[in-house]
């Protein structure tokens, strides 16, 4: 896409986060609910990872499954897509399975 010449490449990228695919809709209310329900801030999880070139080109992706090692502790974040006909138990198991895959990778 193209962006406004009065907007920096970083402002352009940041305007899209958090991505609707991980926040839900309507976005503002969904983000309020996330803040109410989730014990920890998402930080890297659901954020953008990528690179920028001197020619104002960039390529990014969304961090959907993340692991962080800090102070000898291993933190894992994973999620599932909740929609109107989701079964809570199945979504929970999907999240656990995704997290287990991260833990197995470093085992």
Question: What do the PLM-derived regions correspond to, one by one?
Answer:
Residues 1-107:
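Conserved hydrophobic core element of enzyme catalytic domains
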């Amino acid at each position: 896409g193209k962006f406004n010449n009065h907007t920096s490449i970083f402002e352009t990228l940041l305007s899209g986060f958090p991505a609707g695919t991980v926040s839900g809709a309507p976005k503002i209310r969904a983000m309020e609910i996330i803040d109410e329900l989730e014990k920890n801030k998402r930080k890297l999880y659901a954020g953008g990872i990528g690179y920028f070139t001197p020619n104002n080109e960039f390529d990014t992706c969304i961090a959907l499954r993340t692991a962080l090692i800090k102070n000898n502790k291993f933190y894992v974040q994973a999620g599932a897509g909740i929609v109107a006909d989701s079964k809570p138990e199945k979504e929970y198991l999907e999240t656990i399975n995704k997290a287990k895959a991260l833990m197995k990778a470093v085992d």
